[in-house]
Regions:
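Structured beta-strand-rich core segments of catalytic domains in phosphoester-bond hydrolases
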Residues: 1-67
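Catalytic metal-binding/acid-base residues of hydrolase active sites
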Residues: 58-60, 119-121, 164-165
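Surface-exposed cleft-lining segments at the edges of enzyme active sites
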Residues: 25-35, 59-95, 131-136
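A structure-centric signal for secondary-structure junctions around beta-strands
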Residues: 3-4, 39, 51, 109, ...
Length: 242
């Protein structure tokens, strides 16, 4: 397990004892990520029973660059672009971290799955009101360009988009305001990004959203994907412990 200020609850098969494991690895972090090391934004686990590394991410929400901030027309107090710059630093560092993590997993014969809240919508299909959102944090051109830069058929694949290539959404986040959930005026900012072989093993996937706004517990909904893991094990030539 590797993390930045996060822990994992683990339990051995047949054992009722639950243990909290924490293992911070910050020495090898990209310079831009060191300021985030205590915020619990990332955890990574090598599964014992599958040749698979699973990571969970909570990427900073960010904000608008200073030149787009308009006092009196913002819900948050103008900050001159500080939150925007902080997010951009994270993006630069995390891109390098992903490259290193992919290479390490591949060297060990493991597939890689990175899941979580990326706080970036990649394409027009990922935002219901994309025309009016192009100057909004999470859908800025530079954020979308960054997201595209970490994807390729040979590195990481957006699994849900691969399963639903021409569909609006499926959205994973809706504002609490304006009846956005009932009208499905949402954003797709939560992802499964998988190594190519694992992505090909995905057989179904989408958003597990509540039936009504009254049932919501969060402004996000889980993104759920079913993978045919035996197919991955067979294609890699690896065998799971058994």
């Amino acid at each position: 397990m590797r993390s930045w200020g996060a822990g994992v609850l683990v339990r051995a098969p047949g054992d009722s004892h639950v243990e909290l494991r924490e293992h911070a690895e910050t020495g090898s972090l990209a310079r831009e990520l060191k300021a985030f090391a205590a915020e619990g934004r990332y955890v990574e686990v090598d599964l014992a029973d599958q040749p698979l590394t699973v990571a969970s991410l909570y990427l900073p929400k960010g904000g608008l660059p200073g030149h787009l901030q308009q006092p009196g027309r913002m819900r948050e107090k103008p900050d001159g672009g500080a939150k925007y710059e902080r997010k951009m630093r994270f993006l630069r560092g995390f891109a390098r971290h992903l490259t290193a993590t992919r290479r390490a997993a591949a060297a060990q014969g493991r597939e890689l799955l990175v899941m979580g809240d990326f706080n970036v919508a990649h394409t027009r299909l990922d935002v219901k009101n994309w025309r009016t959102s192009q100057r909004s944090e999470g859908f800025l051109p530079e954020e979308r360009e960054w997201f595209g830069s970490i994807l390729s058929p040979r590195s990481l694949v957006d699994v849900v988009r691969r399963l639903h290539p021409d569909v609006d959404g499926p959205y994973s986040w809706w504002s609490w305001m304006g009846g956005a959930f009932d009208r499905d005026t949402g954003w797709r900012i939560d992802y499964h990004l998988a190594s190519p072989r694992l992505a090909k093993a995905a057989i179904a996937g989408g958003t597990d959203r509540e039936a009504s706004a009254a049932e919501r517990l969060s402004d996000h909904a889980p993104v759920v994907v079913d993978y045919d893991l035996p197919q991955v094990v067979t294609s890699t030539g690896l065998r799971t412990p058994g």
